[in-house]
């Protein structure tokens, strides 16, 4: 009974929440109907206002919203059925007390089943919403409009569906908590509130534009280039089709061409549009009449030196003053303003806020990554798509990138040299190493001080004699005398004497120390060890080698003379003792002496003896006694068996085997042969075997093995791609720097003009400074030129004032900061049909 009463109280509380949610939905509908309509940009040209009143387009947008709503929630038939159930529940609230408890339980069970269905539908729509790539962006208006459709999702609905019966006793407390909540919280917690059809109707066509044209930039995707502005946009606010419609019939003028177009053409007679990026926003200022205005600096990221100033007054300032820096905007029929005196800057203003179109954020706008000379980061704006460095730092960065390869190949160990650590590598130190005389001042004194400071100081061992102490020698003599007296008075024990009698290295060294015997080097009269330089050591070793070589040559000559005398006295003994295969010893013969002309046939015979030739061969050398004994034993065994050895025929070519030996070999082969019989494949022809092998090579199994690849090919490709990226990234950056330097044809700089000497240069002359001429610093433009012969020059005027120093012609052409690289030339380009032109015939007419 108590459980049924708790269910009844829960049902009544849910019905009350449903009524409160309906009242809130009616209030939200009334609030939404009071919203102002948002008019589109560039539409309508009457009385300075731009409104759209096409009913057909409104109906299309409404249909599009309903279709998108269907795709968001899927099948909404069940929700419509729920709408019909809600009025019935209102009627039942009046007679719910008269019904039996069983009927109430059945109704509660049905309601729980319906809630489960709603939960499943909401989960499916949530999954479809997260998985769909083109989710429409919800504006604040859409969030309010669709709030009635969301019911209760997530943990609130799950908690309400899974309430145990034991917790139903706390319903009075929950009812009190629900009464304390705000209407918005009640609407979020109520899961039986019916949807409001009127809330799905859009207020205006522009309010549904984000839903119809969703634009999202996924992470990691390349940003597309906008067609009209030529810039890459992040979070674009206008679709490409909408931009096509807006630009239809209007003239596009680039921001860099605006200055010439304003002067040469009448832009008031036609509709024209220009695009730019807000690169700088000046703090809002107050005019003389007390009204606030703001100024924007616009640029198209093509030429970062020229800017266009846009002034925002009145309503334009109130609506757009919060626009962020870096936003790409479009201007329709902007009004030109008079520039400031002394400048040629283009100034524009807009009289209507709808003439300013916010298109999105510029991806390529950034600041230079280099640092100034004072260490602060550079604040120059750059186009990141072209280069990451401004025109003032691109040359230094290019030199740094070009010299990286030499740095890698050098043998720099990372340790700073001592000279560099002391600061001896500055400009002053390098110039003043040898000294110079300039302007009546000599730098020899500074050079000597520099040499004394940079010279390495020799470390001297700090001893008592080196220190300036009075009576140092007397103190040292007294100490030596005390040590000698202590030695004499020292009593030696018996154990110490026994240890000293042992022939150990320690005992011997101690005896030498006590007896004061000089070292072995001093006994031989050699000089003590001293440190010498490397060059002196090399000279000393060279002298030692020359002396040793000279001694060796003298010994060889002396040995040769002795050997020749012995050979003359007893040549027979020398020839008999020398072995045939014995090589002469090193230094046995004098290399420069002439060899003896003794004939080899008469070797061993003295002068006057007869040489006899015999037909008998010389006697054989005596064999070893052990071999002779084994041979005799074998002969005796053969004779005991009655066998004899036949003498081998010396003229026979093949070795004859006995029949018994052949039989033994055949038996041995048969015993080692395999037991299996020969396969029939061995008897088949070789061509058939070859065909079978080819068939196996063409089989699927072999092709599968042949085409098998490793599982780590993906990782290998990623590693190769990473290596290629590391290799090509520096080259790509270097190429970007080169392209930027080639595109820079002029550059602003600080120059000085001397009115006395009538010149303009990058720095003043010393005479102008010393004589106090009338010169002043100002901004100038340096321009780069090249001649047809390849010579290059820089000028601060429109054209150089001098002829080419190489060819003498005055054919200057505009060029970039970097000299254009020329590749290898073909033979036709290097061919000179007329031969080489000589200097005296050049420029002759």
Swiss-Prot record:
Residues 93-131 form a coiled coil. Its main location: nucleus. Residues 33-47, 55-65 have a biased composition (Acidic residues). Residues 754-773 are annotated as: Zinc finger-like 2. Each zinc finger-like domain binds a zinc ion and is involved in both ssDNA and dsDNA binding, as is the OB-fold domain. The N-terminal domain mediates homodimerization. Residues 179-211 have a biased composition (Polar residues). Residues 15-65, 78-218, 564-586, 643-688 are annotated as: Disordered. Self-associates. Residues 368-393 are annotated as: Zinc finger-like 1. InterPro entries: Mcm10, MCM10_OB, NA-bd_OB-fold, Rep_factor_Mcm10_C, Znf_Mcm10/DnaG, Znf_Mcm10_C. Residues 15-26, 120-130, 570-580 have a biased composition (Low complexity). Keywords: Coiled coil, DNA damage, DNA replication, DNA-binding, Metal-binding, Nucleus, Zinc, Zinc-finger. One of its GO terms (cellular component) is nucleus. It comes from Xenopus tropicalis (Western clawed frog). Residues 217-367 are annotated as: OB-fold domain. Residues 1-145 are annotated as: N-terminal domain. Belongs to the MCM10 family. Residues 787-807 are annotated as: Zinc finger-like 3. Pfam families: Mcm10, MCM10_OB, zf-CCCH_Mcm10, zf-primase. Acts as a replication initiation factor that brings together the MCM2-7 helicase and the DNA polymerase alpha/primase complex in order to initiate DNA replication. Additionally, plays a role in preventing DNA damage during replication. This is Protein MCM10 homolog. The keyword Zinc-finger applies.
């Amino acid at each position: 009974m108590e459980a049924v009463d708790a269910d009844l109280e829960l049902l009544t509380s849910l019905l009350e929440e449903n009524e409160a949610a309906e009242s809130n939905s009616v209030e939200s509908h009334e609030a939404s109907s009071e919203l102002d309509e948002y008019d589109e940009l560039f539409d309508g040209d009457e009385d300075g206002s731009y409104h759209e009143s096409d009913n057909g387009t409104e109906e299309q947008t409404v249909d599009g919203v309903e279709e998108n709503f269907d795709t968001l929630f899927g099948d909404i038939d069940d929700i419509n059925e729920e709408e019909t159930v809600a009025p019935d529940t209102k009627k039942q609230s009046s007679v719910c007390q008269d019904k039996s408890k069983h009927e109430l339980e059945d109704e509660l069970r049905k309601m729980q089943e319906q809630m489960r269905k709603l939960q499943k539908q909401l989960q499916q729509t949530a999954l479809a919403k997260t998985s769909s790539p083109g989710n429409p962006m919800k504006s604040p208006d859409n969030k309010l409009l669709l709030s009635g459709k969301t019911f209760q999702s997530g943990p609130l609905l799950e908690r309400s569906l899974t309430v145990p019966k034991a917790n139903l006793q706390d319903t009075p407390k929950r009812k009190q908590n629900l009464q304390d909540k705000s209407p918005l919280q009640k609407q979020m917690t109520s899961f039986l509130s019916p949807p409001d059809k009127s809330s799905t109707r859009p207020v205006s066509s522009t309010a549904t534009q984000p839903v119809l044209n969703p634009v999202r930039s996924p992470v990691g995707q390349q940003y597309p280039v906008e067609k009209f502005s030529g810039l890459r946009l992040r979070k674009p606010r206008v679709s490409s089709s909408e931009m096509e419609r807006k630009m239809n019939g209007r003239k596009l003028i680039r921001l860099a061409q605006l200055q010439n177009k304003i002067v040469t053409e009448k832009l008031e007679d036609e509709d024209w549009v220009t695009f730019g990026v807000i690169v700088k926003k000046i703090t809002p200022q107050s005019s003389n009449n007390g009204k606030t205005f703001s100024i924007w600096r616009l640029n198209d990221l093509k030429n970062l030196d020229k800017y266009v100033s846009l002034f925002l007054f009145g309503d334009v300032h109130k609506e757009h003053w919060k626009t962020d820096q870096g936003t790409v905007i479009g201007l329709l029929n902007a009004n030109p303003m008079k520039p400031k005196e002394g400048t040629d800057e283009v100034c524009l203003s807009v009289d209507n806020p709808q003439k300013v179109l916010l298109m999105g954020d510029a991806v390529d706008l950034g600041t230079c990554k280099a640092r100034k000379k004072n260490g602060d980061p550079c604040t120059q704006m750059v186009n990141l798509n072209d280069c990451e460095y401004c025109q003032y730092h691109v040359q230094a960065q290019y030199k740094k990138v070009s010299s990286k390869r030499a740095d890698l190949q050098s043998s720099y160990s990372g340790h700073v040299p001592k000279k560099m650590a002391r600061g001896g590598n500055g400009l002053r130190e390098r110039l003043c190493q040898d000294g110079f005389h300039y302007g009546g001042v000599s730098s020899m004194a500074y050079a000597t001080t520099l040499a004394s400071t940079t010279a390495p100081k020799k470390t001297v061992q700090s001893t008592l004699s080196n220190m300036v102490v009075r009576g140092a020698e007397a103190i040292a003599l007294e100490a030596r005398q005390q040590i000698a007296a202590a030695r004499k008075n020292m009593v030696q024990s018996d154990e110490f004497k026994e240890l000293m009698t042992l022939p150990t290295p320690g005992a011997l060294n101690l005896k030498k120390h006590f007896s004061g015997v000089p070292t072995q080097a001093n006994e031989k009269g050699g000089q003590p060890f001293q440190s010498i330089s490397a060059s002196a050591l090399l000279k000393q070793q060279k002298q030692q080698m020359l002396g040793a070589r000279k001694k060796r040559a003298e010994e060889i000559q002396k040995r040769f003379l002795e050997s020749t005398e012995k050979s003359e006295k007893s040549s027979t003994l020398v020839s008999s003792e020398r072995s045939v295969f014995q090589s002469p010893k090193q230094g046995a013969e004098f290399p420069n002496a002439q060899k003896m002309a003794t004939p080899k046939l008469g070797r061993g015979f003295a002068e006057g003896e007869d040489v006899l030739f015999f037909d008998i061969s010389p006697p054989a050398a005596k064999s070893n006694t052990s071999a002779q004994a084994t041979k005799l034993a074998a002969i005796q065994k053969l004779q005991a068996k009655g066998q004899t050895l036949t003498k081998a025929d010396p003229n026979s070519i093949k070795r004859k085997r006995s029949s018994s030996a052949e039989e033994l070999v055949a038996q041995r082969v048969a015993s080692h042969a395999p037991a299996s019989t020969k396969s029939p494949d061995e008897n088949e022809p070789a061509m058939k075997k070859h065909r079978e092998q080819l068939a196996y090579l063409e089989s699927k199994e072999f092709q599968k093995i042949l085409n098998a690849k490793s599982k780590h090919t993906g990782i290998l490709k990623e590693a190769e791609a990473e290596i290629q990226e590391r290799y090509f990234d520096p080259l790509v950056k270097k190429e970007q720097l080169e392209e930027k330097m080639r595109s820079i044809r002029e550059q602003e700089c600080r120059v000085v003009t001397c009115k006395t000497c009538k010149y303009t240069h990058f720095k003043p002359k010393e005479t102008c400074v010393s004589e106090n001429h009338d010169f002043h610093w100002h901004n100038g433009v340096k321009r780069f030129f090249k001649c047809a012969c390849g010579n290059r020059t820089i000028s601060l005027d429109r054209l150089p004032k001098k002829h080419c120093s190489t060819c003498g012609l005055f054919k200057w052409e505009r060029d970039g900061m970097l000299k254009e690289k020329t590749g290898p030339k073909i033979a036709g380009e290097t061919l000179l049909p007329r031969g080489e032109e000589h200097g005296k015939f050049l420029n002759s007419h």
